[in-house]
Amino acid sequence: MSNVTHQPKIGFVSLGCPKNLVDSERILTELRTEGYDVVPRYDDADMVIVNTCGFIDSAVQESLEAIGEALNENGKVIVTGCLGAKEDQIREVHPKVLEITGPHSYEQVLQHVHHYVPKPKHNPFLSLVPEQGVKLTPRHYAYLKISEGCNHRCTFCIIPSMRGDLVSRPIGDVLSEAKRLVDAGVKEILVISQDTSAYGVDVKHRTGFHNGEPVKTSMVSLCEQLSKLGVWTRLHYVYPYPHVDDVIPLMAEGKILPYLDIPLQHASPRILKLMKRPGSVDRQLARIKQWREICPELTLRSTFIVGFPGETEEDFQMLLDFLKEARLDRVGCFKYSPVEGAGANELPDQVPEEVKEERWNRFMQLQQQISAERLQEKVGREILVIVDEVDEEGAIGRSMADAPEIDGAVYLNGETNVKLGDIVRVKVENADEYDLWGSRV
């Protein structure tokens, strides 16, 4: 008679942004610690968890399709994540879903799993769960989420209604997690949240402790502490508060990467007011000039929305003029899309789709030209590159100016004598609108 017991298996689908990816990693870590096996196929799983995104309508549709696929292929499905905050919307399309929870409801998800697929008899000390937890990124970089929620009420966004107001993680916990990641071989930490520059606002920047030492709960203090770990530290989702100025000297000193992801959204004061975003374009241009004087190597990434309700040709021209003057390095642009529950839906003068498309094309054409010129300035220079891929044809990596998934790449043709996560010096030989080509020095 066999005494082998069945190890319960869970399928997992993770959608959406890096913040959602971190939530998925946390759930998967708990499941693995409890003895569940995580499998890549629907038909091998006892149950499937779908971690959804609900930020824009296309993300909602993708999430609903993923839920439907999991139901068709497996039948036992738990839904969590941002779209989970709209249970009625999910039930209307997929009434057979077993349970639905909102974002960062880790304990609820685990309780539901226990109910439908009981926990195995398991000794966690015999498991192979790494100390840093289960990660869905390559081993050499990882996302470090420092807070949940957001205190802003931008009219195009529904994140606060799904994830709530800002809740900062204790700085000691954040720094301990960062140390575990570095000890596990991570070479690049990507700091994320809904609003990274607001870190600690909700707790009045109280003093926390790490390794017995007092540390202020703030973005600047966090950056100073992370710089001691000796790895690349990259800041994402930074709202343009005045104290952002204080991290630029840290970048100039090489303590954190000279890279700032700062979503500006528009340049017309009138449109920014309708968006409920800060609206002084002249001040932003002056700050960008000052930042570059302090840190000439600074890479600026931003995102913008065209076709926002009420946007006139004059407003759009202000945006193009801003691009010409700011000469940002990395830029994303979205055509405004109504999101159920967003305040902007009630605004008058909705922009026709064909006008949005035409403005988006003009925006992208201008920014591609600027990006190509900025990258051409790097030809002939030596830069540091972290290796992301290696095959028989060569290696692909990223410079300090490139975040994974969203920015450009550096191609090292014929360079096969490197490993994932290696940081190598490269001489840039060629460039296009987004990418660089070079050879190892």
Curated annotation (Swiss-Prot):
Keywords: 4Fe-4S, Cytoplasm, Iron, Iron-sulfur, Metal-binding, S-adenosyl-L-methionine, Transferase. GO terms for molecular function: 4 iron, 4 sulfur cluster binding; aspartic acid methylthiotransferase activity; metal ion binding; protein methylthiotransferase activity. It catalyses: L-aspartate(89)-[ribosomal protein uS12]-hydrogen + (sulfur carrier)-SH + AH2 + 2 S-adenosyl-L-methionine = 3-methylsulfanyl-L-aspartate(89)-[ribosomal protein uS12]-hydrogen + (sulfur carrier)-H + 5'-deoxyadenosine + L-methionine + A + S-adenosyl-L-homocysteine + 2 H(+). It is an enzyme of class 2 (transferase). It holds the Pfam family Radical_SAM. Its EC number is 2.8.4.4. It is found in: Cytoplasm. Gene3D superfamilies: Methylthiotransferase, N-terminal domain (3.40.50.12160), Nucleic acid-binding proteins (2.40.50.140), tm_1862 like domain (3.80.30.20). GO terms for cellular component: cytosol. InterPro entries: Elp3/MiaA/NifB-like_rSAM, Methylthiotransferase, Methylthiotransferase_CS, Methylthiotransferase_N, Methylthiotransferase_N_sf, NA-bd_OB-fold, Ribosomal_uS12_MeSTrfase_RimO, rSAM. [4Fe-4S] cluster 1 binds at residues 17, 53, 82. Its cofactor is [4Fe-4S] cluster. Binds 2 [4Fe-4S] clusters. One cluster is coordinated with 3 cysteines and an exchangeable S-adenosyl-L-methionine. GO terms for biological process: tRNA modification. Its main location: cytoplasm. Residues 376-441 form the TRAM domain. It comes from the Bacteria. Residues 136-373 form the Radical SAM core domain. [4Fe-4S] cluster 2 binds at residues 150, 154, 157. Residues 8-118 form the MTTase N-terminal domain. Catalyzes the methylthiolation of an aspartic acid residue of ribosomal protein uS12. Belongs to the methylthiotransferase family. RimO subfamily. This is Ribosomal protein uS12 methylthiotransferase RimO. The gene is rimO.
